[in-house]
């Protein structure tokens, strides 16, 4: 069975694996403050797909560095979606 198929016995989907990946990535990222909450949520599916929200805190306080680190992390997460055969879509 491929990772994109639903495993009925263990209830694992590619979206669950993606959320788990994001959480582990953030937990081990040196600039993420893992002493504070890391939360990844997915809302109910609608005509646009699934909305995934990612909440985490960065150790850096300098605004410019903060923005650079956050952008790097989000870029990595977006690029990794294809590994899980997920497509990223942003609605205006």
Task: Give the positions of each predicted feature.
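Structured, soluble regulatory/oligomerization domains located on the cytosolic or IMS-facing side
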Residues: 1-92
């Amino acid at each position: 069975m491929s990772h994109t198929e639903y495993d009925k016995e263990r209830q694992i989907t590619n979206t669950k694996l993606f959320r788990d990946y994001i959480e582990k990535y953030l937990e081990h990222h040196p600039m993420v403050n893992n002493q504070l909450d890391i939360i990844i949520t997915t809302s109910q599916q609608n005509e646009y797909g699934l909305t995934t929200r990612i909440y985490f805190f960065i150790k850096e306080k300098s605004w410019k560095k903060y923005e650079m680190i956050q952008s790097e992390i989000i870029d990595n997460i977006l690029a990794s979606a294809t590994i899980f055969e997920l497509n990223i879509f942003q609605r205006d």
